[in-house]
Regions:
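Ribosome large-subunit tunnel/peptidyl-transferase-proximal elements
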Residues: 1-233
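Intrinsically disordered, compositionally biased charged tails
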Residues: 1-3, 226-283
Length: 283
């Protein structure tokens, strides 16, 4: 069963591409026709590609790995922040910091700096600074929160990158490709899909179109997270059951020893009887 359908995408305007003169020929396989100088995306292919991408993202989430979402364009920022925060995945909706992937250790240091400032505030160290120093530190903390707050829990490189606008987020895509991180993306008719591993042909400018695609993607990731949770619970129950059986096995050992001893005693008694009978015959 598809995660979304043709009509839902149609109502969201996901089929509207860019002007014909702005098109990228490499998107030709995903274009249905041209109408009034605008390319129309083949939504049947969008449904297929969206399902393919969603299933792959589900498996990534199920394995316990993270997907980093990138959408800094105005139409997508609020939608991405709301929907992705709800499923607990990291996201970037402000400026993409150069080296966020290729220079990840430095980014982690900046995130840790933010945590250090919080710790100073909580333990009272912050009170020892002058008013001017407090103001500078507060501004620094606010800037870090704005740019890196949404990836604070990303302790290692993500397993995949999801991009809403390939052209606008070209730097993020380049960094991901350098590190062999698979890229999932909404790709409009004016974009080059060459570096995208999972192409989702769709209008990346309309808010409704972006929301529909993200709903399907977030739904798949949520499924993966839920299945992982259930598997862990099942594993924990099996471990508890196994631990519960362990004492029973220990208790069984004395009974086995007693049974063996009784068997040996019986054999010895039988031998004694045979010996006694033999001695009587000899007499």
């Amino acid at each position: 069963m598809s995660r979304t359908d043709f009509n839902t995408l149609l109502e969201a305007g996901a089929h509207f591409g860019h002007l014909k003169r702005k098109w990228n020929p490499k998107m030709a396989p995903y274009i249905f026709t041209e109408k009034n100088g605008i390319h129309i995306i083949d939504l049947h292919k969008t449904v297929l590609k969206l399902d393919e991408a969603a299933n792959a993202l589900k498996q990534i989430a199920k394995s316990g790995r993270r997907v980093l979402f990138v959408a800094t364009k105005k139409q997508a920022k609020e939608i991405v922040a709301e929907k992705i925060a709800a499923i607990g995945m990291p996201y970037v909706t402000e400026r993409w910091a150069g080296g966020m992937l290729t220079n990840f250790p430095t980014i982690r240091k900046a995130v840790k700096k933010m945590s250090t400032i919080d710790k100073m505030t909580n333990d009272g160290t912050f009170d020892n600074f002058s008013k001017r120093e407090k103001l500078q530190i507060a501004r620094q903390r606010a800037k870090l929160e704005k740019n890196l707050g949404s990836i604070a829990d990303l302790t290692r490189l993500p397993a995949a990158l999801f991009v809403v606008d390939v052209q606008k987020e070209s730097n993020a895509v380049k960094e991901a490709k350098r590190l062999n991180i698979p890229v999932f993306a909404m790709v409009d008719t004016c974009c080059d899909p060459t570096d995208i591993d999972y192409v989702i042909p769709a209008n990346d400018d309309a808010t409704k179109s972006i929301a529909v695609i993200l709903d399907a993607v977030c739904g798949a990731i949520s499924e993966g997270l839920e299945e992982r949770k259930l598997e862990k619970e099942k594993e924990a129950q099996e471990n508890e059951a196994h631990e519960g059986d362990a004492p029973a096995k220990k208790d069984a050992k004395p009974r086995i020893k007693k049974a063996v001893k009784a068997s040996v005693d019986a054999e010895e008694a039988t031998v004694a009887e045979v010996v006694a009978a033999t001695e009587q015959k000899a007499e």
